[in-house]
């Protein structure tokens, strides 16, 4: 978990211009109130690779006690093929990538199919077809599946507004893409408003 500190109560312009950086707790002024921006990364848990169904809410919300279905209508979703969408502005149901699982599968098929096919041909030539892999294999492997990051600004008792969190994280993602370029791809993310604090997966 990586923590950043953001001055609470800063004007919107200051928050939008803020560059996220690690700030040791001993440098914080006592009189200032800061919010902690927490970033948690991972690919898999005790039950295997993370399931993107939680992130785009493509499951029955009535089965989850910690999710308020009314507040879930305000969630904001983004993916690399369609951009922004929300429950209030649903996308075309005939779309090829309607869920984050579909988006991730489609991205992997577009970018990695040629590599997998050539690798599998090579494996066949050296008589090691047991090494062959497919797109579902890549998506379910702890080494090659998409990595999930969770951002939260503040705590249960005191947290930033969803708008401020959205502004900070979208700026952070742009900085991240500028720094790492084509080596790292942001496939999809979701701003969740229906749980105890606003956070982004």
List each language-model region with its residue ranges:
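N-terminal nicking endonuclease/strand-transfer module with a His-rich metal-binding environment
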Residues: 2-201
């Amino acid at each position: 978990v990586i923590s950043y500190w953001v001055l609470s109560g800063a004007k919107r312009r200051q928050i939008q211009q803020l560059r996220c950086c690690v700030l040791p707790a001993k440098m914080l002024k006592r009189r200032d109130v800061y919010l902690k921006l927490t970033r948690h990364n991972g690919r898999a848990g005790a039950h295997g690779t993370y399931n993107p169904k939680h992130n785009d809410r493509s499951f029955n919300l009535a089965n989850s006690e910690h999710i308020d279905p009314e507040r879930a209508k305000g969630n904001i979703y983004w993916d690399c093929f369609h951009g922004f969408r929300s429950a209030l502005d649903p996308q075309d149901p005939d779309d090829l990538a309607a869920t984050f699982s579909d988006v991730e599968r489609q991205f992997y098929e577009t970018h990695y199919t040629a590599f997998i096919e050539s690798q599998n041909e090579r494996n066949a030539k050296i008589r090691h077809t047991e090494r062959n892999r497919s797109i579902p294999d890549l998506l379910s492997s702890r080494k090659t599946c998409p990595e999930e990051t969770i951002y939260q600004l503040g705590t249960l008792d005191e947290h930033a507004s969803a708008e401020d969190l959205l502004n900070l994280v979208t700026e952070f993602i742009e900085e991240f893409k500028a720094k790492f370029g084509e080596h790292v791809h942001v496939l999809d993310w979701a701003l969740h408003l229906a749980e105890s604090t606003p956070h982004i997966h």
